[in-house]
Design a protein with these regions (language model features):
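Active-site neighborhoods and metal-handling regions in enzymes and metal-associated proteins
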Residues: 1-108
Length: 108
């Protein structure tokens, strides 16, 4: 890893490939969430499913534990604050749901 100045760190081709793999884990996780997102499902269920999926891919949840975050996904329903925590309240027909996810793969 080459360092330029004090703020830019160049990544090797190998590091970039690992970062790409981490991004693929996140993309696939969000795809799995989208498949299951429907009325009656709880954000807490989606969160556990996402954690299990990320771990099955050899990665770890990127948000869980970061700054004390207790969840794998950050889920906001309707006018809820951005990056809300998953709850047991079922999603209802017509709800607007936003989901954020992160994963760490081989340190990236």
């Amino acid at each position: 890893m080459a360092v330029f100045g004090e703020s830019i760190i160049y990544k090797s081709r190998e590091e970039i490939e690992i970062m790409r793999q981490a991004a693929l884990v996140v993309s696939r996780t969000l795809g799995e969430v989208a498949k299951r997102l429907k009325p009656g499902i709880t954000p807490a269920f989606l969160d556990q499913m996402a954690e299990d999926y990320i771990k099955s891919q050899g990665a770890i949840p990127g948000f869980k534990g970061l700054y004390g975050c207790p969840s794998t996904l950050l889920i906001s329903v309707n006018e809820q604050v951005v990056h809300g925590l998953p709850t047991e309240k079922p999603i209802e027909e017509g709800d607007i749901v936003s989901v954020d996810c992160g994963a760490v793969f081989k340190g990236y």
